[in-house]
Amino acid sequence: MNSFHCRPFRQSQGFTLVEMIGVLAIIAILIALLLPKIFTLIASSNARSLAAALRTYETAVANYYADVGTLYPLNVTGVPAAENGGNSATVTSLPARLTLDSTDPLNTGANQWVRFQGPYLEKFNTNTPPGLGTTMFMPASAAIALGAAVTGTNVGWDLKGDDGNSDLPTGARVAYLRVDGVSDTEFSELDGIIDAGIGTNLTERQLRGRVKYNPGNDRMYIYLAHQ
């Protein structure tokens, strides 16, 4: 007589609760170790993008100055005028003038407009900074007094990086970049590119050299040129 035999199913060998907790703990540790490095790599890449853009801005400002003879944007009558906002959407701002074509009707041909040979810059959009930040501006205004203390907000730069006091002549016309929405890590990455070796502590690095940083409002102020 034939007999039928059925093997019982083996129970699957899964993780125990203790083993699962151990695996999750290891994953959490790996994430904790890797995330800062990932963020640093991203910040480093973005900082390099902004550093490259800065060279373009410097060249544009220098060429504008060579033609027009001023760092201030020209007003409608062709007279240089300080403009503290630096928003590209403002037609009288420096970035708006740098991207203006010489054949544009905004070029009235009056006074120093006859020397204008723009565009000097292909694009500058306040709402889309290259690499770092949420918004950027390019003001053109007067510098603080020579030798006055540099702060995280004033129009002064310790370009030599030696004493925390402004090296710019009193009242000099200054073109600079203000970038909002920058983290401490992002500032450090850009500062390491632009101002490598300047400052022996965090406070000095934030206030000396071409790149200043105000951690209170996450803003960078980057010197471009002065006259």
Segments from the language model and where they lie:
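Structured segments of extracytoplasmic/periplasmic soluble domains
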Residues: 60-68, 101, 119, 123-127, ...
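N-terminal membrane-insertion helices
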Residues: 50, 54-61
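Short, glycine/small-hydrophobic-rich surface segments
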Residues: 61-118
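Surface-exposed patches in mature extracellular/periplasmic domains of secreted proteins
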Residues: 68-76, 128-139, 202-212
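Amphipathic alpha-helical segments typified by the pilin-like N-terminal helix
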Residues: 12-52
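N-terminal leader/signal peptides at the extreme start of proteins
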Residues: 1-15
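Short, surface-exposed interaction loops/tails
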Residues: 149-227
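Secreted/periplasmic proteins that engage bacterial cell-wall peptidoglycan
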Residues: 114-163
